[in-house]
UniProtKB/Swiss-Prot annotation:
SUPFAM superfamilies: Recombination protein RecR. It comes from Shewanella sp. (strain MR-4). One of its GO terms (molecular function) is zinc ion binding. GO terms for biological process: DNA recombination; DNA repair. This is Recombination protein RecR. A zinc finger (C4-type) spans 57-72.
Length: 199
């Protein structure tokens, strides 16, 4: 059966979301149309506002509606000499949820991937280098993902930071709290053994 053009457009538009296939998109569209049109209109309004009004922080590159995000605009956090480098704005939220970091962030919005055409320019590394050259950064914490690309990105940034005499550290990798060793992959287990600490 062929749907009306507007319904088909809605279903196809919902498929742009990660993990949403044709059947899931169809169920979402029908849910909004049959049971919750008010929520559908609210969703449409929120999407429209977000797409037009959310940009990037001029200092750290995370998402914000202002020129500076709340962390960079904060007198306490914005003047911190410690910067944590992450790949995505979602990483900022994850670290903030832990409540153990009180410095600033720099969001790469990806990782180095020459095959995909992602180089230093696309990651905003010129802006990060300006931060490092300012003399206001004492420590750079590299919190990129423990993937091949994340490690390559961390090494590239570490080399850049060394030129500016900045202390560089890398977040630890290893066995998760509450995890059982029999379910941990061999690479993670090797990292845990190599990064062990004395008690």
């Amino acid at each position: 059966m062929k749907f009306s053009p507007l319904l088909d457009e809605l279903i196809q538009s919902l498929r742009c979301l990660p993990g949403v296939g044709p059947k899931s998109a169809q169920r979402m569209a029908f849910q909004l149309l049959e049971r919750d049109r008010k929520a559908g209109l609210k969703l449409a309004s929120a999407l429209s506002s977000a797409m037009s009004d959310i940009g990037h922080c001029q200092s750290c590159r995370t998402y914000t509606e202002e020129s500076l995000c709340p962390i960079c605009a904060s007198h306490k956090r914005g003047s911190s000499s410690t910067i944590c480098v992450v790949e995505t704005p979602a990483d900022v939220l994850a670290i903030e949820a832990g409540g153990h970091f009180s410095g600033r962030y720099f969001v790469l919005l990806g990782h180095l991937s020459p095959l995909d055409g992602v180089g230093p320019e696309e990651l905003g590394l010129a802006l990060l280098e300006r931060h490092l050259a300012s003399g206001d950064v004492a420590e750079l914490i590299l919190a990129t993902n423990p993937t091949v690309e994340g490690e390559a990105t961390a090494h590239f940034i570490a080399d850049m930071a060394r030129r500016h005499k900045v202390v560089i550290s890398r977040i630890a990798h290893g066995v998760p709290v509450g995890g059982e060793l029999e379910y941990v992959d061999s690479t993670t287990l090797a990292l845990s053994f190599n990064g062990r600490i004395p008690l």
